[in-house]
C-alpha cells in the first residue's frame, strides 16, 4: 500500500494540471504560430510560469486499490500484483488465469 501522502500529492498534481491546462495549451498554440525565434521567447517564458507540478508529464497512474504507481495496467486500473490476485480469486469475469 502506498503512503497516503504520496496519493494526496498525486491528487494535488492532478488538480494543478487541470487548472493550468488551458494556459499551457494556448501558449503552445501561440508558439507554433509565430515563425521568428525572438518573439517566441516571450511565450516560452509564459509557458514556464505555471508551477512545475502542473505539467502533465509529472502525473502517474496509480492502482485503484493500493495506490501503487508501478506495474499499472490501464485496462483495469490495477497494479500487476493485485490484478494477479483478482484473477486467481475469479473476481474479474472473462479473464483467463496465468502464472508468471
Curated annotation (Swiss-Prot):
MF (Gene Ontology): rRNA binding; structural constituent of ribosome
One cellular component (GO) term of this entry: small ribosomal subunit
Biological role: Binds 16S rRNA, required for the assembly of 30S particles.
Keyword Nucleotide-binding among UniProt keywords: no
Keyword terms: Chloroplast, Plastid, Ribonucleoprotein, Ribosomal protein, RNA-binding, rRNA-binding
Family per record: Belongs to the universal ribosomal protein uS14 family.
Natural source organism: Jasminum nudiflorum
Protein location: Plastid, Chloroplast
Signal peptide limits: none
Recorded name of the encoding gene: rps14
Gene Ontology BP terms: translation
Pfam entry (one): Ribosomal_S14
Protein name, as recorded: Small ribosomal subunit protein uS14c
InterPro entries named in the record: Ribosomal_uS14 (IPR001209), Ribosomal_uS14_bac/plastid (IPR023036), Ribosomal_uS14_CS (IPR018271)
Subunit details: Part of the 30S ribosomal subunit.
Major site of localization recorded for this protein: plastid
Amino acid at each position: 500500500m502506498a503512503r497516503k501522502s504520496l496519493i494526496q500529492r498525486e491528487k494535488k498534481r492532478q488538480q494543478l494540471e487541470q487548472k493550468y491546462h488551458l494556459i499551457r495549451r494556448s501558449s503552445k498554440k501561440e508558439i507554433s504560430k509565430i515563425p521568428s525565434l525572438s518573439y517566441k521567447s516571450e511565450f516560452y517564458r509564459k509557458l514556464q510560469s505555471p508551477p512545475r507540478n502542473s505539467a502533465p508529464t509529472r502525473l502517474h497512474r496509480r492502482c485503484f486499490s493500493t495506490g501503487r504507481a508501478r506495474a499499472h495496467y490501464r485496462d483495469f486500473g490495477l497494479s500487476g500484483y493485485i490484478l494477479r490476485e483478482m484473477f486467481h480469486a475469479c473476481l474479474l469475469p472473462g479473464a483467463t488465469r496465468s502464472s508468471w
